[in-house]
Amino acid sequence: MLDIQLLRKDLDGVAKRLADRGYTLDVAAFSALEAERRAIQTHTEELQARRNSLSKQIGAMKGKGEDTSAVMAEVSGIGDDMKASEAKLGEIQARLSDLMLGMPNVAHESVPVGKDEADNVEVRRWGTPRQFDFEVKDHVDVGTPLGLDFETGAKLAGARFTMLRGPIARLHRALAQFMIDTHTQQHGYTETYTPYIVNPEILYGTGQLPKFADDMFRVEKGGAENTVTQYLISTSEISLTNTVRESIVDGAALPIKLTAHSPCFRSEAGSYGRDTRGMIRQHQFDKVEMVQVVAPETSYAALDEMVGHAEAILQKLGLPYRVITLCTGDMGFSAAKTFDLEVWLPAQNTYREISSCSNTEAFQARRMQARFRNAQGKPELVHTLNGSGLAVGRTLVAVLENYQNADGSVTVPEVLRPYMGGMERIDAPAQTS
């Protein structure tokens, strides 16, 4: 959530910055609500001051033995007026809050202004795409003989679900374990196991609600009169980041660095017809997530560090990639700045997103009321960052395509072999007649 004081001081400036993100701020509606709030708040304060004055007057009158009934009647009437005024003020503040909850974060000044992914800016590349001396297959054609089973996945759960079997399932697990081990042993993160189902207020904290309700899988339990609504997580960023909600952390405890391997569930409501083949866009997929909770002055150094942690995974796997700075129109709702990592997929002859690392600054912290005690001992909002380290399914796709061989086998990257019992390559099972 944006700082409402920022809007009160520079409404037109904030509206311009939000317009760069493709969001139209209803300046007139906000101004009208603010004017009404100020008027009611002023009236409430005047009533409070009048009641306080009359209360003192009653005390003085009683000391003199004078009749206070008329003044007490006025005080009683003021009390009724104050209750009505406070109720109206609460209603206005709730409407302001709803408006604020729908506003995205403002972009950091270093973010390129643009409309969509065409305006993103490439920062650097690593690795040279492999030159094949045979016809390259995509991950579906490579993986199906090795244990990718899209047919059974669809039969069990519908489109955009996949079954993994045998060595492909083991390779998928090996990737996740390798990522977690690297982040915990080399990058300083604490491994965390989180709930996969969370309460609605948790999603408000990290910004998925109210705007992206249609992208979430909702779980309801109980009868018609006592229904409890919860949601499957779309990323473990949600549960990891909310571990500091409604708390004041000792400044000496920062930075807090957490990582988790979890399934992620997304309805992909706006993705009809996109990436319908294979594992690129699934309703259920695994991801290793990185989250950092830091002091404001260190958050952009932490963002660079986090990008480096995601890059390290790709480099150790020997997968060519590029780093992209997202423009204002392509960033996620909560982000102030985002770097995407895109891995090379030879069958598509292009780079595809495999990690997204974002600094949300105080946007999520304000929604969660997550604070730390600064050097002066005063509570201050933390900054929160999140990043994929990496999306496991897409990393599997990249390994299958980049490490495929002419005979249909797949070479196991060296760093994964200890997790695969020393296996150097995955071969299709022999056909039986």
Curated annotation (Swiss-Prot):
Molecular-function GO terms, alphabetical: ATP binding; serine-tRNA ligase activity
Reaction catalysed by this enzyme: tRNA(Ser) + L-serine + ATP = L-seryl-tRNA(Ser) + AMP + diphosphate + H(+); tRNA(Sec) + L-serine + ATP = L-seryl-tRNA(Sec) + AMP + diphosphate + H(+)
Assigned GO CC terms: cytoplasm
Gene3D superfamilies in the cross-refs: Bira Bifunctional Protein, Domain 2 (3.30.930.10), Serine-tRNA synthetase, tRNA binding domain (1.10.287.40)
Pathway note: Aminoacyl-tRNA biosynthesis; selenocysteinyl-tRNA(Sec) biosynthesis; L-seryl-tRNA(Sec) from L-serine and tRNA(Sec): step 1/1
EC class: ligase
Binding-site residues, L-serine: T235, S236, E237, E289, S388
InterPro entries named among the record's database cross-references: aa-tRNA-synt_IIb, aa-tRNA-synth_II, aa-tRNA-synth_II/BPL/LPL, Ser-tRNA-ligase_type_1, Ser-tRNA-synth_1_N, SerRS_1_N_sf, SerRS_core, tRNA-bd_arm
Keyword terms of this UniProt record: Aminoacyl-tRNA synthetase, ATP-binding, Cytoplasm, Ligase, Nucleotide-binding, Protein biosynthesis
Binding site for ATP: R266, S267, E268, E353, I354, S355, S356
An annotated GO BP: seryl-tRNA aminoacylation
Enzyme Commission (EC) number: 6.1.1.11
Keyword Aminoacyl-tRNA synthetase: yes
Pfam families in the record: Seryl_tRNA_N, tRNA-synt_2b
Subcellular location(s) of the protein: Cytoplasm
Homology family: Belongs to the class-II aminoacyl-tRNA synthetase family. Type-1 seryl-tRNA synthetase subfamily.
UniProt domain comment: Consists of two distinct domains, a catalytic core and a N-terminal extension that is involved in tRNA binding.
Classification via NCBIfam families: serS
Function according to Swiss-Prot or TrEMBL: Catalyzes the attachment of serine to tRNA(Ser). Is also able to aminoacylate tRNA(Sec) with serine, to form the misacylated tRNA L-seryl-tRNA(Sec), which will be further converted into selenocysteinyl-tRNA(Sec).
Subunit structure, as described in the record: Homodimer. The tRNA molecule binds across the dimer.
UniProt name for this protein: Serine--tRNA ligase
Organism name: Burkholderia cenocepacia (strain ATCC BAA-245 / DSM 16553 / LMG 16656 / NCTC 13227 / J2315 / CF5610)
